[in-house]
């Protein structure tokens, strides 16, 4: 079963950390990511640049695009990364998300496969 | 049961209640298709209604239903070649398991438990958990659930459809959680059962007789879980808690009016049921793993075994609340503890404990009603009337509203003028 795991966190809190804290937290995430990838539970995924780099493109019914600076929604917790999971069921996906080493919020959603 | 033959539809209703969850669980396990499983159970019930009135109710109605459902499943699946493996499973189980089916072997006990944990999965919202549990484990029809919650049947049907879709599309598994997850997942199940119980127990007002008694349904579900998980003390604690409430249900109303605990006629309590529930609670306590339901039941047991309100062991009750407060540090627990303190140390001490809770409980009618009672007892009549008035604004429950209106009519002058005194007449109970 494939799931998309979206990882959202408080960017301001991240910014407020010291360099040493950030390095330590990166080390935790990298170790975690490697372990999950080696176990075959993470198929792919990436960290994203901060939401200040996001651009939203909105299309109307006539196909006209409006381009706006910023992410879909302005919120305290912003999307910071994602992973595609391959695990047996939702419990396994929840267990994986629950072991994420940082104080973030994660959304797990099944991916539509075949038609 | 053997003397007067009962009408077939009555036996069918009773049997379905007991067997529906079992049938559905076994079929979901084999077929992996929730809707098909429910449809087959429904078909089997219809077949029973056709056969039983003329041919007589079979000796083992549960096994009869299971066999009927399985045969229909095989007929349905034969049309699709890809179900060959499932047909093999169904055929094997029909021949192997039928004699023992309705006696509840360990295998089908597991089925129901698995299904219950799926129904109460934390990835489903609370309303969906409640509807799924009542429908699939409790054997209630969608319409009956709607009536119980005063919600249109179509709303319940929608919730069930959405929940089942999520179970399928998000691949919510069908299993009993492993040991590491079990405490949290079991707590979720117990929360759902207690919520169903409270919906029935608190909402009942003695005048809506057509409304289904969800409290009894919840008690039945809890007793099922207690049978399936006999070594979980919190399950037994919750069951004891429900039974202690139900043992006093008769005395909660007099002529349609709500009667509070201090004023209840204790002769109307079911003392045999109270003894059994206390014994159950003691068994849970001996397992040595305390929890919120055991503590709440222990508090209720103190009330239920006291000869009168005045003779209640308030020291023990306050001590139990101190333990409960550690397990569950909520303002509601602190409010209830304060009310016990009122009996042990007097209303002034209790009022002092109540004041800091105003911010968090100010929107709850029972906070104001409790405060009004204490204010009346210390002679602050005007403030008492104001607090009762606030409580009245905050509740829609007709029985509670009547009680508050009576208090307000009495002017809040003295405890004797409150409904408590009026209800104590010899014929009131």
Tell me the role of every PLM-derived stretch.
Chain A
Residues 1-115:
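Conserved, structured core segments of small domains
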């Amino acid at each position: 079963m494939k799931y998309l795991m979206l990882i959202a966190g408080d960017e301001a809190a991240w910014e407020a950390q010291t360099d040493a804290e950030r390095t330590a937290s990166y080390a935790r995430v990298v170790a975690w990511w490697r372990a999950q990838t080696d176990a075959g539970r993470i198929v792919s995924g990436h960290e994203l640049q901060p939401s200040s780099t996001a651009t939203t493109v909105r299309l109307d019914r006539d196909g006209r695009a409006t381009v706006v600076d910023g992410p879909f929604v302005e919120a305290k917790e912003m999307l910071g990364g994602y992973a595609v999971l391959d695990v047996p069921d939702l419990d396994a996906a929840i267990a994986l998300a629950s072991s994420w080493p940082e104080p973030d919020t994660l959304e797990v959603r099944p991916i539509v496969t075949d038609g | 049961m053997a003397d007067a033959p009962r009408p077939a539809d009555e036996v069918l209703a009773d049997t379905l209640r007991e067997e529906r969850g079992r049938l559905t669980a076994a079929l979901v396990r084999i077929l992996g298709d929730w809707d098909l499983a429910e449809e087959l159970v429904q078909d089997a019930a219809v077949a029973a209604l056709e056969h039983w009135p003329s041919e007589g109710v079979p000796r083992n109605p549960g096994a009869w239903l299971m066999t009927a459902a399985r045969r229909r499943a095989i007929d349905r699946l034969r049309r699709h070649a890809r179900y060959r493996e499932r047909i093999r499973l169904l055929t094997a189980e029909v021949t192997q398991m039928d004699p023992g089916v309705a006696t509840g072997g360990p295998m089908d006990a597991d089925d129901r438990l698995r299904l219950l944990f799926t129904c109460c999965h934390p990835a489903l919202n609370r309303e969906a958990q409640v509807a799924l549990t009542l429908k699939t484990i409790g054997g209630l029809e969608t319409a009956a659930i709607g009536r119980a919650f005063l919600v249109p049947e179509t709303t319940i049907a929608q919730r069930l459809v959405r929940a089942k879709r999520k179970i399928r599309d998000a691949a919510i598994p069908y299993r009993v959680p492993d040991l590491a997850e079990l405490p949290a997942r079991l707590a979720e199940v117990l929360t759902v059962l207690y919520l169903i119980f409270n919906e029935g127990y608190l909402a009942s007002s003695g005048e809506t007789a057509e409304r289904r008694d969800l409290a009894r349904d919840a008690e039945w579900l809890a007793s099922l879980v207690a049978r399936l998980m006999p070594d979980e003390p919190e399950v037994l604690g919750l069951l004891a808690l429900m039974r202690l409430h139900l043992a006093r249900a008769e005395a909660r109303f007099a002529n349609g009016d709500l009667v509070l605990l201090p004023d209840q006629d204790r002769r109307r309590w079911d003392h045999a049921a109270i003894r059994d529930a206390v014994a159950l609670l003691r068994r849970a306590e001996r397992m040595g793993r305390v929890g919120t339901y055991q503590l709440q039941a222990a508090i209720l047991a103190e009330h239920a075994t006291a000869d009168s309100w005045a003779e209640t062991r308030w020291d023990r009750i306050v001590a139990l609340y101190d333990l409960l407060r550690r397990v569950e540090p909520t303002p509601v627990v602190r409010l209830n503890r304060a009310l016990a303190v009122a009996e042990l140390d007097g209303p002034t001490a209790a009022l002092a404990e109540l004041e800091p809770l105003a911010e968090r409980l100010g929107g709850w009618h029972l906070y104001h009603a409790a405060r009004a009672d204490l204010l009346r007892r210390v002679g602050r009549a005007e403030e008492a009337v104001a607090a009762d008035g606030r409580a009245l604004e905050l509740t829609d429950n007709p029985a509670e509203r009547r009680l508050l209106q009576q208090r307000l009519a009495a002017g809040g002058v003295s405890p004797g003028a409150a409904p408590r005194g009026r209800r104590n007449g010899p014929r009131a109970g």
